[in-house]
């Protein structure tokens, strides 16, 4: 029995939810999202909450029950409040620039890396003296935000000896000891 799937999802005042065929549409102050529902999952929309039920109790539907409840919850939270991911560049000479939602990274390669971000993601670059450069990504779509942040991080993952690279804020990198002298 899914514990997460049984919790109803509350709908805030400014968010509108509509179900048509097997697609759920969520519209809020920050944007619009939709999700296709597969499997034998029922979505019941009441006045101010959404209840996710499953028709059959087989293994696949038990797994999808909690998944769709959390996807709907994250969609509602996203169009109402939004999500934020922070990355930091650690390394000498590592820089980032924001040119109208185009991220220009100088991270130790012989050339700059240019990433064009989707329209639903807003970009902010903080560069302060004597501090690491921060890249702040904001969006109402949690899935897309996570994919883009992971793609940026994968360009220069933190290396285990000095910790240089791109990492999430508050990410702990396990450091290895170097070679020991005889």
Curated annotation (Swiss-Prot):
Keywords: Ribonucleoprotein, Ribosomal protein, RNA-binding, rRNA-binding. GO terms for cellular component: cytosolic large ribosomal subunit. GO terms for biological process: cytoplasmic translation. SUPFAM superfamilies: Ribosomal protein L6 (SSF56053). The keyword Lyase does not apply. It holds the Pfam family Ribosomal_L6. One of its GO terms (molecular function) is structural constituent of ribosome. Gene3D superfamilies: Ribosomal protein L6, alpha-beta domain. PANTHER family: 60S/50S RIBOSOMAL PROTEIN L6/L9, LARGE RIBOSOMAL SUBUNIT PROTEIN UL6M. NCBIfam families: L6_bact. This protein binds to the 23S rRNA, and is important in its secondary structure. It is located near the subunit interface in the base of the L7/L12 stalk, and near the tRNA binding site of the peptidyltransferase center. Part of the 50S ribosomal subunit. Belongs to the universal ribosomal protein uL6 family. This is Large ribosomal subunit protein uL6. The gene is rplF.
């Amino acid at each position: 029995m899914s514990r997460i799937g049984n919790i109803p999802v509350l709908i805030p005042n400014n968010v509108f939810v509509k179900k048509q065929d097997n697609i759920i549409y969520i519209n809020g102050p920050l944007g619009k999202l939709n999700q296709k529902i597969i499997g034998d999952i029922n979505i019941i929309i009441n006045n101010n909450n959404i209840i996710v039920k499953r028709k059959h109790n087989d293994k696949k539907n038990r797994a999808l029950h909690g998944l769709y409840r959390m996807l709907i919850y994250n969609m509602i939270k996203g169009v109402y409040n939004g999500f934020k991911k922070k990355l930091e560049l650690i390394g000498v000479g590592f820089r980032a620039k924001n040119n109208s939602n185009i991220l220009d990274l100088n991270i130790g390669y012989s050339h700059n890396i240019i990433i064009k971000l989707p329209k639903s993601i807003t970009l902010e670059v903080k560069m302060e003296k004597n501090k690491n450069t921060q890249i702040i990504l904001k969006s109402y779509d949690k899935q897309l935000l996570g994919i883009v942040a992971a793609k940026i991080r994968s360009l220069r993952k933190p290396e285990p000896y000095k910790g240089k690279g791109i990492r999430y804020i508050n990410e702990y990198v396990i450091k290895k000891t170097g070679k020991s002298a005889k």
